[in-house]
């Protein structure tokens, strides 16, 4: 429980000082709802329009511009990061439907209420993404015509393709 207390303290400090106070956030309920949404959907493609539709279905009618601003606040505080998709055949970055990962899986697990049994693959993918960044790679998500490669990693002239799987 000491570990969870520490993680909870870090989370509250980041939320209060790095996000709420720094950006003069007034809609704290939405800030929390959006972070819960991101925590629940790590490693999945997202679009601001789809998030807006989901939030509206939950009784929170928020403009996509506001969602983009709040997402940027999270990114600036290093709570989350987004990863562009890379068209492997066309060899170009795609601007839509990025993926989102947490900077710290412990913080993510705190938000969703602990490690959940069905989350192992999402959490593993998040951990691998963070490790690839620590190793100095520039990381994108590989887009194929009929699927995706979890990560396309580039460092200098080296390119590595990584697929994360819990069970094969």
Q: Which positions does each model-derived feature cover?
A:
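Accessory nucleic acid-recognition modules appended to NTPase machines
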Residues: 2-159, 166
């Amino acid at each position: 429980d000491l570990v969870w207390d520490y993680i909870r303290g870090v989370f509250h400090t980041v939320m209060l000082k790095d996000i709420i106070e720094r950006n003069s956030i007034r809609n704290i309920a939405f800030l929390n709802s959006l972070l819960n949404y991101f925590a629940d959907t790590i490693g999945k493609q997202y679009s601001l329009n789809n998030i807006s539709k989901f939030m509206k279905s939950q009784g929170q009618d928020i403009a996509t511009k506001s969602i983009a601003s709040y997402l940027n606040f999270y990114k600036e505080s290093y709570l989350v990061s987004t990863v562009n998709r890379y068209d492997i055949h066309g060899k170009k970055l795609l601007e839509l439907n990025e993926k989102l990962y947490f900077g710290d899986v412990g913080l993510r697990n705190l938000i969703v209420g602990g490690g959940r049994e069905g989350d192992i693959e999402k959490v593993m993918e998040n951990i691998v993404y963070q490790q690839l960044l620590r190793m100095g790679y520039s990381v994108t998500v590989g887009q194929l015509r009929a699927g995706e490669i979890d990560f396309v990693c580039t460092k200098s002239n080296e390119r590595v393709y990584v697929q994360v799987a819990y069970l094969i």
